[in-house]
Amino acid sequence: MPPREEMIAVGETKVQVVIGGQGDPLVVLHGAGGNRGWRRWMAAVAERYTVYAPTHPGFGRSDAADWMESIDDLARFYLWFLDVMGLSKVHLLGHSIGGWTAAELATMRPGAIDRLVLVSPTGLKPDEGEIRDIFFYPPEELLQYTVHDPATVPEWAELFGQKPGPAEIEIALRNREMTARLTWKPYMFNPRLPHFLPRVPNPTLIVWGREDQIVPVICGEQYRRLLPNATLRVLERCGHLPPIEQPDVFANLVLDFLGRA
């Protein structure tokens, strides 16, 4: 079944959601770059699961949410989203700030989800090094730190090969502004999260790129230690975007992990 787009009202906030596939529900929470649409890895996973990919409030074409001030708020919003959609015991996957959101949600209501996939998540202060300040760089330069080797990215031309037009620039600025609103002070982590992660009993797959220059791979080790039932997979020759950089490998990891449910 081809994917479709819907605008879903969660309270007074309407969010854009891409839905496709068949089978048990998998909710996908995007990172700071915004919802990149129906990607190659999603199409592979959607052969066995129904994928729900919402665009966060304040991002893309979703409504603004000026009341929202933290990733905690975003996690609570997505608990409400699950209720509105009538979804229970979903598999939950999040990338970068979406991974942080997924982790926070899991600490709030672990019974709402079945299996958890965290992909290069922010949310923890690195024991060594630091999370790169993504607001310091112009988009073109930031992309150099985000992807390890553009030549190996199958969808590079489609995603990044064209100079953005006015509409794309406006969305990028909107995404950037909302990311700053949600993740600033302290930058990209919640000092309370480490104390709540041990509450999450759900089987968890953590995926990281060995060459991630945005969030140090040591954060993956920290998540693995704090989550009682977690496995960490580190992909070689991969940066901060495993689903985009190695879509087939990533899709197979996800399918194998979810298939154990």
Language model segments and positions:
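Acidic catalytic loop of the alpha/beta-hydrolase fold
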Residues: E211-V215
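Conserved HGGG/HGGXW glycine-rich cap/lid loop of the alpha/beta-hydrolase fold
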Residues: G11-R61
